[in-house]
């Protein structure tokens, strides 16, 4: 499954997390832990927000990864699907709602 994480960092947490982030190597930043693959991550540094898309079969593994960042920021996590998966789900919804 794919998951979309949206984060927001409070102003008082911004510099501490920024210092943590810039001290990490690219390999450390790319490591989401066993069973979690980072598809992409985008930052809005002016607004102190961003998004990440990860893929994993185990929500617990995703929760562990997100949990390491929770002391610094609020994170909303939602399961997401790609176009083909959404089309298949949409076909099923339409079929289920035929009268």
Task: Spell out what each predicted region is.
Residues 64-71, 95:
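Short, intrinsically disordered, mixed-charge
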């Amino acid at each position: 499954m794919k998951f979309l994480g949206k984060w927001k960092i409070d102003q008082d947490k911004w510099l501490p997390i920024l210092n943590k982030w810039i001290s990490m190597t690219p390999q450390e930043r790319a490591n989401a832990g066993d069973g979690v693959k980072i598809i992409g991550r985008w930052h809005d540094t002016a607004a102190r927000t961003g998004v990440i898309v990860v893929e994993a079969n185990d929500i617990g593994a995703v929760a562990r990864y997100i949990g390491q960042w929770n002391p610094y920021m609020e994170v909303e996590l939602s399961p997401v699907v790609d176009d083909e998966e959404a089309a298949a789900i949409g076909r099923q919804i339409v079929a289920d709602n035929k009268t």
